[in-house]
Amino acid sequence: MSIYLSNKYLKIYYNIVKRSFDRTPPKTYEKHHIIPKALGGTDNSKNLAYLTPKEHFIAHLLLLKITEGSNKCKMAFAVNLSLIHI
């Protein structure tokens, strides 16, 4: 079974990440793991996107929407952690 469900949220997530590669990093940015470390992602530069704080929070909300099973719990934890920084 796939980690991600194929849906509109995945497309929005993809567009946020893709946009980050098509621009210079914003003045205020946060590093985002495209494939979250909790799901097997690495710190490799190809797995990092430079997002604004708002984009970063939205990206984590989208990951929560597109994951399933035990991975959904991991993404919920990540969303809760990101609330600390707001």
Listing of model-derived features with the role each one plays in the protein:
Residues M1-D22, L64:
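Short helix-coil boundary/hinge micro-motifs
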Residues K27-I35, F57, I66, K74-L81:
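Charged, low-complexity intrinsically disordered segments
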Residues L48-K74:
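Short Cys/His-centered divalent metal-binding micro-motifs
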